[in-house]
Design a protein with these regions (language model features):
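N-terminal alpha-helical interaction modules that lie
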Residues: 1-75, 91-133
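Flexible helix-coil transition and linker loops at the boundaries of alpha-helical arrays
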Residues: 76-80
Length: 133
């Protein structure tokens, strides 16, 4: 049971970090922010859908490497696309992630890296230190 509780905790941390990053990127109130479901995001000419299709095909690490190599951290839309990318991975089943050599800890680490590179690292640290609800 402890392992399941830990996974739930990590998933909640990831969701909290995503909400915090999106609110910082878009400048909206933290509790009301969600990225729209329609896919208008691109990273260096590739649509977010292309990266998400790689995830669906089990090429998660390859997709992550590609999106991180191409992201312009000074472009808010690029950063939002990467956050949406990690949100999508976090929504996958544990069995799918395990089968394809990926973990929720990697999602959390990736989000932390994006926050640091985009200049939001110290602010995200505050959110991670807050209680996860």
């Amino acid at each position: 049971m402890f392992v399941e509780d830990e996974k739930d905790y990590i998933m909640r941390m990831i969701k909290q970090m995503i909400r915090a990053l999106v609110s910082l990127i878009l400048g909206k109130k933290f509790t009301l922010v969600e990225l729209p479901n329609e896919n208008k995001y691109e990273v260096s000419g590739s649509t977010l859908d292309e990266y998400l299709m790689m995830v669906d095909a089990g090429r998660i690490n390859e997709a992550e490497n590609a999106i991180l190599e191409n992201v312009d951290y000074s472009d808010k839309n690029d950063v939002a696309a990467v956050v949406k990318f990690y949100e999508y991975i976090n929504e996958q089943e544990d069995a799918f992630l395990e089968e394809h050599g990926y973990s929720r800890e990697e999602v959390l680490d990736g989000l932390k890296q994006v926050a640091e590179e985009a200049g939001y690292g110290s602010m995200i640290g505050l959110f991670l230190d807050a209680p996860v609800i």
